[in-house]
């Protein structure tokens, strides 16, 4: 598979009263065409910042300090807004986090579709809009006749999430980015959304990128996994290899903390300690205060991003020292 998006040394921060939050600190990542890539990490690890920076949709206090995001050889970060508007939704679409808050409660669903079309300079007649919107709603297993004239408050959380996905698909993008698509949903609805995304991927042959704090969701849906910790990318590999042979101590900790329905509680091992403050992150490797394998060098120097066999990449001093995780 060829590379459809290349992220190079992406650094993004938030300016707050207390100081500067270093939310994405030197992220480099290749997204392969027609792949499903999960960006996984704990809450407040910088996952959402990465995709917001990639799409230049950071909030007003967000700043991109450096880096490149290459799409078809062009850097999205240096494009003017009018250039970006030609790409957003038509080629790269973003489904925001929190379906409950992402739809305007005073507007019917059909009005959201109309606004999306107008915002991106597409000229459709009313009948064309209804036809296209209905087609996308059916794709996400919603009844257009029932949904188009409904207000968001008349829809369940799962229905709102599917409406957002339908809106994102309206202009037939080739890349679909989803921020926590299963958060704030009950377990059954989560399963339905995951299955829906699998079907859409197969049907439309698009590239999916999604953010999640739940590595079990990544196991269900993704074929590539990028693991984020404290604003740093610490591991990237195929999903199969991530679960078969996790390279980074943090990745292993995430996997060991998964609790199955029939889990032996004595074998479930939560990661000790708390995630770092990105206002004042630890020196060296940001995971070292919680890592059972930490060495003196981990406290002083940030580990290099190393490519190992095949697709495997890891940022860990164990591999620089020739002492891989066992």
Curated annotation (Swiss-Prot):
Which reactions fall under this protein's catalytic activity?
a dipeptide(out) + ATP + H2O = a dipeptide(in) + ADP + phosphate + H(+)
- Using the record, list the residue span of the signal peptide; answer none if the entry has no such feature: none
How is this protein named in the record?
Answer: Dipeptide transport ATP-binding protein DppD
Say which family it is in: Belongs to the ABC transporter superfamily.
Q: Which domain of life is it from?
A: Bacteria
Q: Which GO terms describe its molecular function?
A: 4 iron, 4 sulfur cluster binding; ATP binding; ATP hydrolysis activity; metal ion binding
Query: Can you say where in the cell this protein is located?
Result: Cell membrane
Known NCBIfam families for this protein? oligo_HPY
Its domain comment says: Contains an N-terminal conserved nucleotide-binding domain and a C-terminal domain bound with a [4Fe-4S] cluster. The C-terminal domain forms a stable loop region and interacts with the N-terminal domain.
- Topology term for the membrane: Peripheral membrane protein
Q: Which SUPFAM superfamilies match?
A: P-loop containing nucleoside triphosphate hydrolases
Q: How is its activity regulated?
A: The C-terminal iron-sulfur cluster may stabilize the structure of the C-terminal loops and may function in the regulation of the transport process.
Tell me the function of this protein: Part of the ABC transporter Dpp involved in dipeptide transport. Responsible for energy coupling to the transport system.
Example of a GO cellular component annotation carried by this entry? plasma membrane
Q: Give binding positions for [4Fe-4S] cluster.
A: 285, 291, 298, 316
Q: Which SMART domains match?
A: AAA
Give its E.C. classification number: 7.4.2.9
User: What keywords are assigned to this protein?
Assistant: 4Fe-4S, ATP-binding, Cell membrane, Iron, Iron-sulfur, Membrane, Metal-binding, Nucleotide-binding, Peptide transport, Protein transport, Translocase, Transport
Positions with a binding annotation for ATP: 44-49, 61, 97
